[in-house]
């Protein structure tokens, strides 16, 4: 019987030879593997300082992905907005940053300061004690020069506040960076107005985890050596006299030198017209007149505050920054480190707080409907104060418009492109202006509020240049358009009606207010100096120009018509008023002292000529 095997002998031999070849190849490759070199003794970690963790041979540690920090504003944008106030004294700077988070309150305070130019210092703070503003805004009305500067650019105020709410540590870093630039150019130095103090921040030891190389036993050794961070320089600014505050005013393009990022030029707040700023043209740096105050400055900046856990208090529901968060160790700040002087704070607000270690916290109730920069910031600060703490309110679900706007913001941050102004943005801006108009309190007419805002120095210079470069025909055309403009005519008629319907007491009060206004007094003094220093030829040319003006001719014609249409009784009353006021003017020392002999003789001649003409009539 013939037996058939399932495998042929030669096939079995071939399979066995292939197995032997594979085994020999594996042994050869293993014998050629290079072992990892042993570290020198000086770099090995001590077993007593290391923690041993054993892993299976087939398991490898996953790679560590660094956390991505989301920034709402770039460094160039923050430098652009911080530049006008980085050289302010620390206390004043901190309160400007706090107040900028309430743009509507600032707008109302600017208008109040404009309507009350004689109020400053502690008296101004007492006058606004009943206003529904944050304490930081109330404190700034003590400095009318500062309010005039902040009123020049409301959009800058809101941008600065949004940056401070979103990235307080970046704002403080920008302050130090810009102060170092100003110190390098020689613009920032101690003076009679303020002290510049440069200190070296203590080196902070930081523990860093180091992972040792993998050894054949599959054991990972970790240690925590102490590494010292390099020391940093901190520049702080304080008033030379704590009871007198000077408002700095400077041109950022001069004091900081060449600006690094020309795509984001620094914001410049020129000194407003009529505000006394003593400027130094050498350094491009000047100060306002000193303002005496005892409690207007109630905050300070702790530049050395590295321990974020010591700001934990029992009444943290009001005076801590919303940018922080709570954990098991206490309150964590985002780097703002603004501390509050409770005594001065209580004098401004009328409260009776007793905690001596308080830090500032943004209060959304004083935002007055002004939207926050983005949805994340709105979630953080869309809260309402209630008894027992803070209660967050539910925000509406994101819509397509909000998602589209968020995508556009992310694209702008990545590419640094100019923002795209969409219809939704325009609607939001219009709604914001409407909300601001509703919250102006006694200044509820937003159009009148914007029209009453003082012109900036740049606008005045541009208007002056246009007027000087215009031809006589162009000036005449502008005058005619103004005379025929129905709106201007309505304003004239309304003013004329108010004057005619005013009582003698009201007219006298207006005259006294105009006479005691320091700006009007300065203008009168400047005009008087120009007249006294003018030559006879210049005066004659000016008289001819005045006589040739059609408006003056029209005024003379109108006056002549009123005189001709007046009744004898009205003329008699007018003559009596003139005769009563003439001796008072001639005997007034303020007028006679300024006149020389020639001017007095000229006045007497004109009076005699007028008397002769009246006798002829």
Curated annotation (Swiss-Prot):
Biased composition (Low complexity): 404-414
Biased composition (Polar residues): 387-396, 453-474, 549-570, 586-599
Descriptive protein name: Uncharacterized protein YacH
Feature: compositional bias, Basic and acidic residues: 490-499, 522-531, 572-585
InterPro entries given in the database record: DUF3300 (IPR021728)
Region spans: Disordered: 387-419, 443-599
């Amino acid at each position: 019987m013939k037996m058939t095997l399932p495998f042929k002998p030669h096939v079995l031999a071939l399979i066995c030879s292939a197995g032997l070849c594979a085994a020999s190849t594996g042994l050869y490759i293993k014998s050629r593997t290079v072992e990892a070199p042993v570290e020198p003794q000086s770099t090995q970690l001590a077993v007593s300082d290391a923690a041993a963790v054993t892993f299976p041979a087939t398991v490898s540690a996953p790679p560590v992905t660094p956390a991505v920090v989301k920034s709402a504003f770039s460094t160039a944008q923050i430098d652009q907005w911080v530049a006008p106030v980085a050289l302010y004294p620390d206390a004043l700077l901190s309160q400007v940053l706090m107040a900028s988070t309430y743009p509507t309150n600032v707008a109302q305070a600017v208008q109040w300061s404009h309507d009350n130019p004689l109020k400053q210092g502690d008296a101004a703070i007492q006058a606004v004690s009943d206003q529904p503003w944050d304490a930081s805004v109330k404190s700034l009305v003590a400095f009318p020069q500062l309010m005039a500067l902040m009123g020049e650019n409301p959009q800058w105020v809101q941008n600065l506040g949004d940056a401070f709410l979103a990235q307080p540590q970046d704002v403080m870093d920008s302050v130090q960076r810009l102060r170092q630039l100003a110190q390098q150019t020689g613009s920032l130095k101690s003076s009679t107005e303020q002290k510049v103090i440069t200190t070296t921040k203590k080196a902070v030891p930081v523990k860093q985890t180091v992972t040792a190389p993998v050894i054949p036993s599959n054991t990972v050794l970790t240690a925590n050596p102490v590494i010292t961070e390099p020391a940093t320089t901190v520049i702080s600014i304080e008033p030379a006299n704590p009871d007198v505050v000077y408002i700095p005013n400077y041109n950022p393009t001069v004091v900081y030198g060449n600006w690094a990022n020309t795509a984001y030029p620094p914001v410049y707040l020129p000194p407003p017209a009529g505000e006394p700023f003593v400027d130094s043209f050498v350094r491009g740096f000047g100060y306002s007149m000193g303002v005496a105050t005892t409690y207007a400055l109630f905050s300070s900046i702790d530049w050395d505050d590295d321990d974020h856990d010591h700001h934990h208090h029992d009444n943290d529901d009001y005076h801590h920054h919303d940018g922080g968060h709570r954990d098991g160790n206490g309150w964590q700040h985002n780097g703002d480190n603004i501390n509050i002087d409770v005594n001065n704070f209580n004098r401004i607000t009328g409260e009776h707080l007793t905690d001596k270690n308080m830090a500032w916290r943004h209060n959304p109730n004083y935002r007055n409907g002004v939207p926050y920069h983005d949805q994340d910031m709105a979630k953080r600060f869309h809260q309402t104060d209630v008894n027992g703490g803070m209660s967050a309110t539910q925000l509406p679900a994101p819509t397509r418009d909000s998602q589209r706007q968020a995508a556009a913001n992310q694209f702008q941050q990545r590419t640094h492109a100019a923002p795209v102004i969409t219809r939704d943005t325009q609607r939001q801006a219009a709604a914001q202006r409407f909300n601001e108009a509703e919250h102006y309190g006694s200044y509820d007419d937003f159009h009148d509020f914007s029209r009453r805002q003082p012109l900036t120095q740049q606008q005045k210079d541009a208007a002056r240049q246009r007027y000087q470069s215009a031809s006589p025909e162009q000036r005449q055309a502008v005058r005619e358009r103004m005379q025929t403009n129905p709106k201007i005519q309505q304003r004239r008629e309304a003013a004329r009606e108010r004057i005619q319907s005013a009582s003698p007491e009201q007219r006298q009060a207006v005259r006294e207010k105009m006479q005691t206004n320091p700006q009007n007094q300065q203008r009168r003094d400047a005009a008087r100096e120009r007249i006294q220093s003018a030559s006879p030829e210049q005066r004659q040319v000016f008289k001819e120009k005045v006589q040739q003006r059609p408006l003056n001719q029209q005024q003379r014609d109108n006056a002549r018509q009123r005189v001709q249409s007046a009744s004898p009784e009205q003329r008699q009353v007018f003559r009596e008023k003139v005769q009563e006021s003439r001796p008072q003017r001639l005997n007034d020392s303020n007028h006679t002292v300024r006149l020389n002999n020639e001017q007095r003789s000229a006045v007497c001649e004109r009076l005699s000529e007028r008397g002769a003409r009246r006798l002829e009539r």
